[in-house]
């Protein structure tokens, strides 16, 4: 006969965050001694960290504050919904924003002000909930920065985040910069201007466009014009300023920004589980 009650299991779950079967097994193994069961689960959690290190993390969230953005990964979206996970993410990004943290090693070693580093706090939570959790990346931009965070579902935290660093003043400029951030989130631009696109990438696109036109049987005399048109199409896909605006497809992003007196200097886009 079990020497513990359902109330004991519930209390142990609430205290440790462990699964129901883990709590039942711990109480059974310790002959119903609650304190020993807590200790046993904590030891088990520490041992499981090594096993979790081999597992993949494709879920999680993106958080941003004051020009700093971080991505923290979990194994499942169930954990991404977890209040403690989200609260810790907010604590980490707040500390990162205050310190203007710009690289992953510094983020992991970041002092959270409660005696823990960001990485130690995350691994402590990982041991409690039984999933691999990891700090994946961080970026810090300067000057005025517009932020946009996008949720894939209403019950999930943001999975896509964009920071846009810009030059401009006033509410209209801030609104235009945020619209540009939404644009980057939706259409995944990689560069601000075509001058930023590496020459070898442009040349490769040009070569592919010309070869494709030849294989389609296009007239030799028309190849240069067709090739140039397709390369320009490539630029519209990857260059922010040349994309049609998602809020007004009769204008390019550049036209909208010019009207608001805004110059985008750089941007960063994070998407959970993506490069």
UniProtKB/Swiss-Prot annotation:
PROSITE patterns linked: EF_TS_1, EF_TS_2
Keywords: Cytoplasm, Elongation factor, Protein biosynthesis
Stretch list, region Involved in Mg(2+) ion dislocation from EF-Tu: 76-79
GO cellular component terms listed in the entry, alphabetical order: cytoplasm
Listed InterPro entries: EF-Ts_dimer_sf, Transl_elong_EFTs/EF1B, Transl_elong_EFTs/EF1B_dimer, Transl_elong_Ts_CS, UBA-like_sf
Localization annotation: Cytoplasm
Pfam families named among the record's database cross-references: EF_TS (PF00889)
Location (main, coarse): cytoplasm
GO molecular function term, any single one: translation elongation factor activity
Transmembrane parts of this sequence: none
UniProt keyword annotation of ATP-binding present: no
Protein task: Associates with the EF-Tu.GDP complex and induces the exchange of GDP to GTP. It remains bound to the aminoacyl-tRNA.EF-Tu.GTP complex up to the GTP hydrolysis stage on the ribosome.
Family label: Belongs to the EF-Ts family.
Protein name as it appears in the record: Elongation factor Ts
Name of the encoding gene: tsf
